[in-house]
């Protein structure tokens, strides 16, 4: 007997209960036995690792050369100040990076509200304490904010040229994920006479830069996109992408601009005559790292963007470039 997709029990729309401003409980039922654990575990992993967010990644403080410095008039040591900066919840409305400043004079509490922002940057927890000034002194710092995924320790984000970086520029471990906590439980569910069903209850808490419902929806979209590649088994040879009978896969003919890479990464690729996605996926990691000004951070970005589309590096393409595609990045 063959079981079709339509015969698998489909749950009703999720029930969402907002517990606090940044926390919500989502209930999904009824689910077939075992499906609640399958979906709950997958969603939890994606929520904690793959939801994009913003974090302070670099700091410069006047008079501070390294993180183990103590500053006269500052109650905390610099290391504690940096730890407090990591918990500032920031959202950039347009773009991936921003540079902000903080200036405070006189004894008192320094909070996230003292960070100078513009219309494009929003600080959610402006009451968050950064440090305390114990006398009539000043603190002046510059903060770099970047967009990213998950958790990235400072050692991973250091570039080869960082040995020549500005003295006093402190690189922080960055937690980009806006999701602070995810927990799920599975309970029994019943539909009429059926009692062998599951109920999935997910408890999500964010830092306020994104609401829990939107975070869950984004996680579901990511899982859907990743699983969609199993709907097409035409490319069974993992080492070679073969053109369809009608020609080359149209995705490979799209310009690399469609990948929405950072300007730095895109310019580095174009400088090496990499104009199409088909050009890019044929390169290996080693080849890309030899590209001038393209470091490990850019390579990680490229791999993540390709992975979201079911693509990867080091792929061999037959008969590339196809007729009509020039080496100068123009169709014709």
UniProtKB/Swiss-Prot annotation:
UniProt-annotated stretches for the region Alpha C-terminal domain (alpha-CTD): 248-332
Lineage: Bacteria, Pseudomonadati, Pseudomonadota, Gammaproteobacteria, Lysobacterales
UniProt keyword annotations, A-Z: DNA-directed RNA polymerase, Nucleotidyltransferase, Transcription, Transferase
Domains as described in the record: The N-terminal domain is essential for RNAP assembly and basal transcription, whereas the C-terminal domain is involved in interaction with transcriptional regulators and with upstream promoter elements.
GO molecular function: DNA binding; DNA-directed RNA polymerase activity; protein dimerization activity
One GO term (biological process): DNA-templated transcription
A Pfam short name: RNA_pol_A_CTD
Job description of the protein: DNA-dependent RNA polymerase catalyzes the transcription of DNA into RNA using the four ribonucleoside triphosphates as substrates.
Name of the protein in question: DNA-directed RNA polymerase subunit alpha
């Amino acid at each position: 007997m063959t079981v079709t997709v339509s015969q698998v029990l489909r749950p009703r729309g999720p029930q969402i209960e907002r517990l606090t401003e940044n926390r919500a409980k989502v209930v999904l039922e009824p689910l077939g036995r075992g499906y609640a654990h399958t979906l709950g575990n997958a969603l939890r992993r994606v929520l904690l690792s793959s939801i994009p967010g913003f974090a302070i990644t670099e700091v410069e403080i006047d008079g501070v050369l390294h993180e183990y410095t103590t500053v006269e008039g500052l109650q905390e040591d610099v290391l504690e100040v940096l730890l407090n900066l990591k918990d500032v919840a920031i959202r950039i409305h347009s773009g991936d990076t921003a540079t902000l400043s903080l200036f405070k004079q006189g004894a008192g509490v320094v909070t996230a509200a003292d960070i100078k922002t513009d219309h494009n940057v929003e600080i959610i927890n402006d009451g968050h304490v950064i440090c305390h000034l114990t006398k009539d002194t000043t603190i002046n710092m510059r903060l770099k904010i970047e967009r990213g995924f998950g958790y990235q320790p400072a050692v991973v984000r250091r570039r080869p040229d960082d040995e020549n970086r500005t003295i006093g520029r402190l690189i922080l471990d960055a937690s980009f994920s806006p999701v602070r906590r995810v927990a799920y439980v599975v309970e029994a569910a019943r539909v009429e006479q059926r009692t062998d069903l599951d109920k999935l209850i997910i408890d999500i808490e964010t830092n306020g830069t994104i609401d829990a419902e939107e975070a869950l929806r984004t996680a579901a979209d990511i899982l859907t996109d990743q699983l969609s590649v199993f709907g097409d088994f035409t490319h069974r040879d993992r080492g070679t992408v073969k053109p369809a009978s009608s020609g080359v896969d149209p995705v490979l003919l799209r310009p690399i601009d469609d990948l929405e890479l950072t300007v730095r990464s895109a310019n580095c690729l174009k400088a090496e005559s990499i104009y199409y996605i088909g050009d890019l996926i044929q390169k290996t990691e080693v080849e890309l790292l030899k590209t001038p000004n393209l470091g490990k951070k850019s390579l990680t970005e490229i791999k993540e963007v390709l992975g979201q589309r079911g693509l990867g590096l080091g792929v061999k393409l037959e008969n590339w470039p196809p007729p009509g595609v020039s080496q100068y990045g123009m169709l014709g």
